[in-house]
Swiss-Prot record:
Sequence positions that bind NAD(+): I175, D195, R200, L262, G263, I264, I286, Y287
GO molecular function: L-threonine 3-dehydrogenase activity; zinc ion binding
Entry's cofactor comment: Binds 2 Zn(2+) ions per subunit.
Recorded coiled-coil stretches: none
Protein known as: L-threonine 3-dehydrogenase
Main location: cytoplasm
Lineage: Bacteria, Pseudomonadati, Pseudomonadota, Gammaproteobacteria, Alteromonadales
Biological source species: Shewanella sp. (strain MR-7)
Pathway involvement of the protein, from the record: Amino-acid degradation; L-threonine degradation via oxydo-reductase pathway; glycine from L-threonine: step 1/2
Domain of life (superkingdom): Bacteria
Quaternary state and interactors: Homotetramer.
Signal peptide positions (record): none
Catalysed transformations (reactions): L-threonine + NAD(+) = (2S)-2-amino-3-oxobutanoate + NADH + H(+)
Length: 341
């Protein structure tokens, strides 16, 4: 089968002929229809420090996808040939304390599709049936293929009550932009998103952000004044991993504010903890998606009218995968879809 593999311990990714993955009794075999390129895939492509420590070579990568079930393990129930599915990319152990308590997204023995095991940038993918999610008929393949990052956005955005609240999102990558759309859809008042990439800030405006602020050109406190905000943001969603962005968030949060952190700093990050203490802030780390509550919420949000389609900006056939990675690497894109049909 065709597959995109991290074939060598250097920058790049290669289209190869790989063996079709073997199934177990509890697995599904999925024929991939569309995949999307993630920031993680770009880290692997660029072969940065994290990738060098994490990714075994060779490895078929990718973890954002939609496909069709073409074979079913003998112990699997609840799926049939022809079901359209995406799936949770975190494969969990099922026997640690968090798994047994139903907090599977916090499994301490997680294995990642396309990171620690064969991924979805291939004509076929095998995953445990437990990890598969059936896609409703009224949700397109394009949208289903980005459920993984959309889930990061939904999990982060819905960590706290948003109705009537003022929300600050730092980082206008695709996940931050989708989070802005979610916040507006569920009833936030002002949703302000910050970045220095004007292309992505314009995408955020299309997705419904109240204000998309280029912090290289505008002062965040001036924007707050313009919006009539006198006490600070009620909820902060940190999506950038950039220390200066988080510092700005701490400066502009209201007393009693709540912060959800998804962005991963490049290293240790010092902050003024007195602001956290004296403002009485709550800070919550976000990892992955809640299994499978986040997945149900994703489908329901789209079915209730949330439109995240503007975040998809580029489509390529798999033979043109290099153009897709170039588009993602340029910073002048939203989500990039690769078609395997």
């Amino acid at each position: 089968m065709k597959a995109l593999s991290k074939l060598k311990a250097e920058k790049g990714i290669w289209l190869v002929d790989a063996p079709k993955p073997e199934m177990g009794h509890n697995d599904l075999l999925i024929k991939i229809k569309k995949t999307a390129i993630c920031g993680t895939d770009m880290h692997i492509y660029n072969w940065d420090e994290w990738s060098q420590k994490t990714i075994p070579v060779p490895m078929v990568v990718g973890h954002e996808y939609v496909g069709e079930v073409v074979d079913i393990g003998q112990e699997v129930r609840g799926f049939k040939i022809g079901d359209r599915v995406s799936g949770e990319g975190h494969i969990t152990c099922g026997h640690c304390r968090n798994c047994r308590a139903g907090r599977t997204h916090l499994c301490r023995n997680t294995s990642g599709v396309g990171v620690n095991r064969e991924g979805s940038f291939a004509e076929y993918l095998v995953i445990p049936a437990f990890n598969a999610f059936k896609i409703p008929d009224d949700i397109s393949d394009d949208l289903a293929s980005i459920f993984d990052p959309f889930g990061n956005a939904v999990h982060t955005a819905l960590s706290f009550d948003l109705v009537g609240e003022d929300v600050l999102i730092t980082g206008a990558g695709p996940i931050g932009i989708m989070a802005a759309a979610v916040c507006r859809h569920v009833g936030a008042r002002h949703v302000v998103i910050t970045d220095v990439n004007e292309y992505r800030l314009e995408l955020a405006r299309k997705m419904g952000a109240t204000r998309a602020v280029n912090v290289a050109q505008e002062n965040l406190k001036d924007v707050m004044k313009e919006l009539g905000m006198t006490e600070g943001f009620d909820v902060g969603l940190e999506m950038s991993g950039v220390p200066s962005a988080f510092h700005a968030m701490l400066d502009t949060m209201n007393h009693g504010g709540k912060i959800a952190m998804l962005g991963i700093p490049g290293g240790e990050m010092a902050i003024d903890w007195s602001k956290v203490i004296f403002k009485g802030l709550v800070i919550k780390g976000i990892y992955g998606r809640e299994m499978f509550e986040t997945w149900y919420k994703m489908a329901s949000l789209i079915q209730s009218g949330l439109d995240i389609s503007p975040i998809i900006t580029h489509h390529y056939k798999i033979d043109d995968f290099q153009k897709g990675f170039d588009a993602m690497g340029s910073g002048q894109s939203g989500k990039v879809i690769l078609s395997w049909d």
